[in-house]
């Protein structure tokens, strides 16, 4: 007997998941996608299995804007284990080196200024970056080490929250592409004792905070009680991650032409940059870019939600 193909639902929006420990970002995404029975899904940048916290999951039309969330700043809290280095720069790797820990709070506070502002990082081998189409972590698992180009990142804030024994808890605000494992490892080297990430929690991604997240257990319970559609109440609008962008409201006439790919003018448009656009009925219809001629060109269009 032929298996009946599951018909997925066309749902759109963003769910802010508090990613559980031990899950890859994709595994968490696929689990929530199954709970929603959503046709299209994507996440906004990976969190290591070791990490927990804010993971925006995009569904349907919201996937068109996931890149802009990927490019946003992030905030983390991390527990650094001092005195050891590992192959992965976190607790999941094998210990490479053990050194005595003779530093205290004052020593840690003294080195942190070296890691604030614009700094250079060499991405870890255990990362999703690719070399000739192959993820670096796969090469690392095969025992290969390849040269990686340093990358410039910005550490907007780096604070020591607590220091107890051979651990230090840090709070970090950083730009996209920052590797907290590398940051902790570099701090450990500066201290002379080495360090790795024992715990990592993302507390903010772009405009989204932990207070807005929902746990996988909560989603599973709601699904068990009410099915796929009951989970819809956790969906935020597709433009939720873009609320700090200028908002333009088009007339019915302008909306028609813009949705057909034509640049249009708006009297209240900024002189340059990206904008959110609503139609004459207040529906989000996409994002645009203000050109040199003052017209707003469509960049990503959305079907009415």
Swiss-Prot record:
Where does the signal sequence lie?
A: none
Which EC number applies?
A: 5.4.99.25
Q: What InterPro entries does the record point to?
A: PsdUridine_synth_cat_dom_sf, PsdUridine_synth_N, PUA-like_sf, PUA_sf, tRNA_psdUridine_synth_TruB, tRNA_sdUridine_synth_fam1_C, TruB_C
Its recorded reaction(s) are:
uridine(55) in tRNA = pseudouridine(55) in tRNA
Q: Active site annotated at which positions?
A: 48
Single annotated GO MF: RNA binding
Q: One of this protein's GO BP terms?
A: tRNA pseudouridine synthesis
Top-level taxon in the UniProt lineage: Bacteria
* Covalent S-S links between cysteines: none
Instruction: Reply yes or no: does the keyword Transcription regulation apply.
Output: no
Entry keyword set: Isomerase, tRNA processing
Q: Does the keyword rRNA-binding apply?
A: no
Task of the protein: Responsible for synthesis of pseudouridine from uracil-55 in the psi GC loop of transfer RNAs.
Q: What family does the database annotate?
A: Belongs to the pseudouridine synthase TruB family. Type 1 subfamily.
This chain belongs to the protein called tRNA pseudouridine synthase B
Q: What is the protein's species of origin?
A: Pseudomonas savastanoi pv. phaseolicola (strain 1448A / Race 6)
The beginning of the lineage is:
Bacteria, Pseudomonadati, Pseudomonadota, Gammaproteobacteria, Pseudomonadales
Corresponding gene? truB
